[in-house]
Design a protein with these regions (language model features):
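Two-component histidine kinase transmitter core
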Residues: 39-40, 110
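Conserved E/DxxT/N motif and adjacent residues on the DHp alpha2 helix
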Residues: 35, 42, 155
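Signal-transduction coiled-coil helices of two-component systems
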Residues: 23, 40-43, 242
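Small-residue-enriched core segments of transmembrane alpha-helices in multipass membrane transport
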Residues: 1-9
Length: 271
């Protein structure tokens, strides 16, 4: 009987201790969340920034140098590249040479240390971030999908898109056939980070997003490097369709990905 009373008494205490531990962990996570939310981004609109409108897509890197703020090692040194509107350029070279950094400077994920990057003659630092990034589409190796439906994930490229626009983007990305074979079609849930889809299917959603956004400037950063040969063939057709009449910067190691580029630029380890 004594042991029974002890058990009855201890059980609520154990539950209370577990609740206190959960509360402490939750508070710690919430504090970290607030820190992230309240963090001011380093890259912001300058006073008097203007909107980028009526974009033709002429891109110029003028004597650009760059190093990260926490590292004095130079990543890029006096790089000059001119990409006429509607033309395509491929960047090739060893890993760590600065190819992705070059692409990241265009939408101002980072700012140049010296020199300037321009679109249609306008320094990207003089433009509002929203208008600048609205004119640039990106397809990367790693695709982030939300835990929602295929329809919702495609619409991320243009939140106010109509159902017809979403389906047209999917068709142009060569994914309409596999969607129509799914029981719920466009209302199929993709799972967290797209776990219910193959690598090729996830990449096609990423491409459909850009078709929907319809930007004049396109960045393809190792878009097919993680795919098998069969998936790459399907994706490559979609990418070629996507790049038509757009200023395109492609980073890739496979010849099949860059062979149609108007110009190939080799980036060395010294940037």
């Amino acid at each position: 009987m004594y042991a029974l009373y002890i058990g009855i008494f201890i059980s609520p205490i154990q539950i209370l201790v577990e609740l206190v531990e959960m509360l402490q962990k939750g508070l710690s996570g919430f504090r970290r969340y607030l820190e992230v939310v309240e963090t001011e981004p380093e890259i912001q609109d300058k006073e008097g920034a203007i909107d980028l409108e009526n974009v033709k897509g002429d891109v110029c890197y003028d004597n650009v140098s760059f190093h990260y703020s926490d590292d004095n090692k130079t990543v890029l040194s006096q790089v000059s590249i001119h990409i006429p509107a509607g033309k395509s350029v491929a960047l090739v070279g060893p890993s760590g040479g600065g190819k992705t950094t070059i692409c990241s400077l265009l939408p101002r994920f980072y700012d140049v240390t010296a020199g300037k990057v321009t679109i249609d003659g306008k320094d990207v630092r003089d433009l509002t971030l929203k208008s600048l990034r609205n004119q640039i589409g990106m397809v990367q190796q790693d695709v982030y999908l939300f835990d929602g439906t295929i329809r919702e994930n495609i619409a991320y490229g243009k939140p106010d898109a109509t159902d017809e626009e979403i389906k047209e983007a999917a068709r142009r990305a060569n994914m309409d056939d596999f969607i129509m074979q799914l029981p719920k079609q466009y209302d199929t849930y993709v799972g967290e980070k797209g776990t219910r889809l193959s690598g090729g299917q996830k990449q096609r959603i990423s491409i459909a997003r850009v078709f929907l956004k319809n930007p004049p400037i396109l960045i393809l950063d190792e878009a097919t490097s993680a795919l098998d040969n069969e998936s790459e063939r399907y994706i490559q057709k979609s990418l070629e369709e996507l790049a038509k009449n757009r200023t395109t910067i492609t980073i890739a190691h496979r010849l099949s990905t860059i062979k149609r580029s108007d110009e190939i630029i080799v980036i060395t380890e010294d940037g």
